Design a protein with these regions (language model features):
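Anion-binding alpha/beta catalytic cores of soluble intermediary-metabolism enzymes, centered on
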Residues: 1-148
Length: 148
């Protein structure tokens, strides 16, 4: 690929069928990363009103906590911030970060990932003038009030 593309839209596919042929196939996000020799990728679901980006891709839920790191959060939010500016023409992106744990961890009472990885990453990103929230509770993040 010659870096001429600005976006790629993929459709649903049966991972089960593809994995029966290629045992190393995880998902098209990882496949596209491999064939484009990209350093990192960001999976995003987008509509006219909302864009949702994922910190991880196709991994079992039990592996998510050990996959989350300060560096991962920083890299993903930097990619998201730049894409919102350059590909969605949003001059000042307002990025909300969802917590990994219920109620965004309740200050370490329900999981430590927010305290150990996510909040330090956000503090570093804010120093770089990226408009990003502290972790918010995922169970209310998509309510009408929260989306205003």
């Amino acid at each position: 690929m010659q870096n001429e593309e600005t976006a790629l839209v993929t459709g649903p596919l049966s991972k089960e069928n593809i994995i029966s042929i290629d045992k190393l196939f995880i998902g098209h996000t990882e496949y596209i990363k491999k064939i484009t020799k990209s350093k990192d990728v960001l999976m995003m679901l987008a509509s006219d009103q909302l864009r949702v980006a994922l910190a991880t891709t196709h991994i079992p839920l039990k592996n998510v906590p050990r996959t989350i790191s300060k560096e991962l959060i920083i890299n993903k939010i930097k990619i998201l911030n730049e894409d919102l500016k350059n590909k969605f023409n949003i001059k000042k992106p307002n990025i909300k970060v969802l917590g990994l744990n219920p109620h965004a961890g309740e200050n370490g009472k329900i999981g430590k990932e927010e305290q150990v990885y996510i909040k330090p990453a956000i503090k570093e990103l804010r120093k770089k003038k990226i408009n990003v929230s502290m972790p918010i509770s995922a169970d209310t993040a998509f309510s009408r009030k929260s989306l205003k």
